[in-house]
A protein has these predicted regions:
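Inter-helical turn/loop elements of alpha-helical hairpins
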Residues: 141, 163-348, 352-380, 406-420, ...
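Generic helix N-cap/helix-start motif at coil->alpha-helix transitions
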Residues: 398-400, 439-440, 477-481, 517-523, ...
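Aliphatic-rich helical/repeat scaffold segments used for oligomerization and domain docking
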Residues: 1-246, 252
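C-terminal structural cap/anchor segments
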Residues: 540-546, 555-565, 585
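Solenoid-like repeat scaffolds
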Residues: 340-343, 427-432, 467-475, 507-516, ...
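Phospho-regulated, Ser/Thr/Pro-rich intrinsically disordered or coiled-coil terminal scaffolds
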Residues: 42, 382-383
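Intrinsically disordered, low-complexity acidic/Ser/Thr-rich segments used as protein-protein interaction/activation
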Residues: 267-269, 346-347, 383-398, 430-436, ...
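A conserved active-site cap/scaffold subdomain adjacent to cofactor or substrate pockets
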Residues: 481-496, 525
């Protein structure tokens, strides 16, 4: 009764709940079984019909519903009867409006409602009046959670109105107008007009309406041309929302329905091919069709002379090649990008190229060059003036540059600075609230550097966070990468069986799909796990596979570790006297690490060679190998490798 009175008084300041009215209100609430929604409908009607008329109308309805039966009316029938009563009281234009508003899956704006009801000019004023009336009658709700004016229907009312829409055979026409409205809303925007954080949030709010429009468009009763255009136009919103799997699935469906005679503009065709080609980098779907799609997108961009699009598509090609271990090709793409960046004329584009070059160099091995590239971006990067350079995805270039700077610093032997930069990259990413940037900071820097420095607690926490992001955004790439990192963590903890099995499963999947992500590093971890189980032959085969992958694609930053581990495995096989082969591998690891400027890996190789010298009772030589390398370190003395080196030096006889 309090709900009824509050609602009635809100709509009619003269409403009185005293005297006989109180008993009438009680009777109405009893009829409605205390169902809040039904009570709101009835209270809303008192402002126009009066209390007695509402009570009488409901009495008549329920008398018909329960005539001939002694049982009480079920609660769902009570609500249905109330809805019928409220709907029948509406004038015909409002009935039609309510039916059509049910098309919207996630609320609507006035222009959207007007387009779905009737796309004729001048209809908005009539629709606005009708919506206001339906709000007054509690059939439509004003959405107060957004800055723009939106309304929605409660699901109970929407389901009821959809039934009515179907009964009037109006669903097909309404869905067509609905899909055409959203196609126009997004396709009419210039590709350089999206503003991340401003209208992107407004557009992602429409995602359920877009999903409904696309489902209809590609149905047997739909219009595939509308669906193809809408899919292509909505790509930036999917990327902004960090929904790569959905973007790939939707673009794949659109590509399968794309016909040569369709009226789809060249820029939108280009955008569709670009999205289809880029998304496998996040979803781990086959890489070769993705490269073909990007090649087609690049040709279209060149055809229309769109430099910004050429830049973005080349960036996509860099992503595909760098994440599939093709560092040679990735570096060549950065050279193409540099040429286009100069023509684009936006300084941030050139800095982005510098960041990509630094990433590629770091994976190839020259860590000082990689560090210089990353430091330059961290110091000088500013947000691009071209809006489209940020509309394609939520990446903060400074965050990613700082993450790669952290890796370069670790390889160079600056573990504490590396940990600081990794932490800063994550903090900056979290301030932007860009999930893609957060995920990259976690996978590239925080998790792996924690593993490399022996901070297993931080590694565990950051890998868990990476999994949470991968799950929330249905992003298989991060999930697979997270499981590889988890496998590496398990091996370091000594859980060899679980760790090597997890790595084996994930790397086998990656290989089948054409995505050997960070193969040399993860193959090294897997080989260590197999060695821990005593499966030396299989561990050696895994090392050889890692070295072959590094040689093929140019991802050589972990070659010193693979060479060192091969030497350790030779020693453990105990076939004859494997010292000579092990010495060669340890010496090769030292040479490669020194050439790359990887002091951290030089120390590991020196430790292995020094241990060998100890077993040969050549203690002075062991000290001569280890001391000069240990003395080059200026920080990180609490990390696992430096503790091991110090322990060995202290144990050697003087």
């Amino acid at each position: 009764m309090e709900l009824f009175i509050a609602r009635a008084e809100a709509l009619d300041s003269d409403f009185s709940s005293g005297g006989e009215n109180l008993s009438a209100i009680a009777a109405i609430c009893r009829h409605l079984d205390g169902i809040p929604l039904a009570i709101e409908f009835a209270a809303a009607r008192t402002a126009t019909l009066g209390l007695e008329e509402v009570a009488a109308g409901l009495r008549d309805r329920f008398a018909l519903l329960s005539s001939g039966r002694r049982a009480a009316v079920p609660r769902h029938r009570t609500l249905r009867t109330t809805l019928d009563w409220s709907y029948d009281l509406l004038p015909e234009p409002e009935q039609r409006l309510l039916r059509h508003l049910a098309i919207f899956a996630a609320g609507f704006t006035l222009p959207a409602a007007a387009a779905v009801v009737d796309d004729a000019d001048g209809i908005e004023a009539q629709v606005a009046y009708g919506i206001s009336s339906l709000v007054h009658k509690s059939l439509v709700t004003l959405d107060r959670s957004t800055s723009t004016t939106r309304w929605n229907l409660l699901e109970t009312i929407r389901a009821y109105a959809l039934e009515k829409l179907a009964a009037h055979d109006e669903i097909g026409a309404a869905m067509r107008r609905h899909a055409k409205f959203y196609r126009h809303l997004f396709a009419s925007r210039g590709l350089d007009s999206y503003v991340p954080g401003e209208d992107m949030d407004q557009f992602t709010r429409e995602i359920d309406n877009v999903r409904a429009a696309l489902d209809w468009s590609f149905s047997s009763a739909g219009d595939a041309e509308i669906g193809v255009t809408l899919t292509a136009a909505y790509v930036p919103a999917w990327l902004h929302a960090a929904l790569p799997t959905e973007c790939r699935e939707r673009t794949e469906r659109a590509m399968n329905n794309l016909a040569s005679g369709m009226n789809v503009s060249v820029p939108l065709r280009m955008q569709l091919h670009f999205a289809f080609g880029l998304m496998p980098a996040y979803t781990m779907s086959p890489v070769e069709p993705a490269k073909a799609a990007l090649a087609k997108a690049l040709a279209l961009a060149e055809q229309i002379g769109d430099l910004q699009a050429q830049f973005q598509i080349l960036w996509g090609l860099w992503v595909l090649n760098s994440e599939s271990g093709e560092c040679h090709t990735a570096y060549s793409v950065t050279e193409q990008l540099a040429l286009v960046a100069r023509r684009v004329g936006d300084p941030s584009a050139s800095l982005m190229v510098e960041r990509l070059r630094g990433f590629t160099l770091q994976m190839q091995g020259p860590h000082q060059q990689a560090r210089e590239c990353s430091e330059h971006v961290v110091r000088h990067y500013t947000a691009p003036t071209d809006r489209r350079l940020t509309a394609w995805g939520q990446f903060d270039q400074r965050v990613l540059a700082r993450a790669m700077l952290a890796r370069a610093l670790w390889f160079q032997g600056y573990a504490e600075q590396a940990m600081d930069q990794a932490r800063l990259s994550l903090e900056e990413a979290q301030r932007t609230n860009f999930l893609l940037s957060i995920g990259e900071a976690l996978r590239v820097a925080v998790s792996d550097i924690a593993l490399m420095t022996g901070d297993l607690e931080t590694a565990d926490q950051s890998i868990t966070l990476l999994f949470e992001i991968a799950t929330s955004r249905n992003a298989p790439f991060w999930g697979i990468f997270g499981r590889c990192l988890r496998g590496k963590l398990l091996v370091i903890r000594g859980e060899f069986a679980q760790g090597s099995a997890l790595l084996g499963t994930e790397l086998e999947f990656c290989e089948r799909a054409g995505w050997p992500i960070w193969y040399p590093e993860f193959m090294c971890a897997m080989a260590e796990g197999l060695a821990g189980l005593g499966e030396i032959a299989e561990a050696r085969a895994t090392v050889e596979k890692g070295l072959a992958s590094a040689d093929h694609g140019g991802e050589r930053s972990y070659c010193p570790e693979l060479l060192r581990l091969r030497g350790e495995l030779l020693l453990r096989q105990a076939i004859g006297q494997p010292w000579s082969g092990a010495e060669q591998d340890f010496s090769a690891a030292l040479r490669v690490a020194r050439r790359q400027g990887a002091l951290a890996l030089e120390l590991r190789a020196a430790l292995s060679l020094a241990r060998l010298r100890v077993t040969q009772a050549r203690h002075d030589e062991a000290r001569r190998i280890l001391t000069p390398i240990y003395d080059r370190f200026t920080e990180g003395f609490g990390t696992a490798d430096l503790r091991a080196a110090r322990g060995m030096l202290e144990a050697l006889p003087s």
